[in-house]
Regions:
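Outer-membrane beta-barrel porins/channels
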Residues: 1-274
Length: 274
């Protein structure tokens, strides 16, 4: 809403990325497989907020495209155990677009670097019907400290968004039960550490540590493909915020409060091999 109490900090925050990722895999031997991919990514971003004075609100919009890469390895330690490692590179963008108010539109640009991620995963066949899996992931969110918006014409900074993110990690464990040759039941839990802190938390991303609870199933139709369906409940710790935004000397806005968030996620996937 344009009229909520924190509108001077944020009204709308939207980032959309699309990733095209052709990849190659090489089976070195029965124990080791390697993979390598190239990523071409597009990004579109929009941020709006209220501003003091006659303009009432401002809008920042920008887009760009860039390249990255990813690599991985899978080690078959035994017929009942596999270990995988993977890495996805950071991606650098220079967003270009406009800063808009009711009366003006200024060409702007901003550099942003989305983080690199490393994942270690383990799969274990426990019995004929049970299998267990887990993973530990590290994301280098420290690449995102400030989003400095510059005039494309003069190079002068005309705005800034502070994030102050730190690296974050996630640990997950799950299991699957093979009820029949066609049906499997899956469940899992994960702890996801936030990259922000109480001192840096913003109204744009009022994030905190998260716990995931998930439940799902798979139907294997053989030549007809596979259908997966799942549900996840996402619990977030209450997130306190104390953010002051400076518009000009002596002109500030402060938001103090607490966020209470949760989410319900449903997903369906169909896959087939040729």
């Amino acid at each position: 809403s344009n009229n909520w109490i924190g509108s001077y900090q944020a009204i709308k925050s939207e980032i959309t990325t699309v990733n095209y990722n052709p990849s190659l895999a090489w089976k070195v031997n029965d124990k080791v497989s390697l993979g390598l991919g190239i990523s071409y990514q597009t990004i579109d971003a929009e941020m709006t907020s209220a501003v003091p004075g006659p303009f009432s609100s401002s809008q920042l919009k920008g887009d760009d495209s860039s390249w990255g890469w990813n690599a991985g390895a899978l080690f078959t330690l035994s017929p009942a155990m596999r270990v995988g490692i993977s890495y996805r590179s950071a991606v650098d963008y220079t967003l270009e677009g406009n800063a808009n108010t009711a009366l003006t539109s200024t060409p702007v640009k901003a550099d942003v670097k989305l983080p690199d991620t490393a994942i270690l995963s383990v799969w274990q066949q426990v019995s004929d019907r049970w299998e267990a899996m887990g993973d530990l992931s590290y994301t280098n969110w420290s690449t995102l400290q400030n989003l400095n918006v510059l005039s494309s014409n003069t190079g002068v900074q005309i705005g800034s968004e502070h994030f102050g993110y730190k690296y974050a990690w996630r640990i997950a464990w799950g299991a699957a039960y093979k009820a029949t040759d066609a049906w499997r039941v899956k469940f899992g839990i994960a702890y996801d550490k936030t990259p922000t802190s109480n001192s840096d938390r913003s109204a744009r991303v009022p994030d905190n540590d998260r716990i995931w609870f998930s439940l799902g199933g798979q139907w294997n139709g053989g030549v007809y493909g596979k259908v997966d369906a799942g549900y996840a409940y996402l619990y977030l710790k209450d997130a306190d915020i104390n953010q002051t935004k400076v518009f000009a000397p002596g002109v500030t806005s402060t938001l103090r409060g607490s966020y209470n968030d949760s989410a319900h996620i449903l997903g369906v996937q169909y896959s087939n091999g040729f």
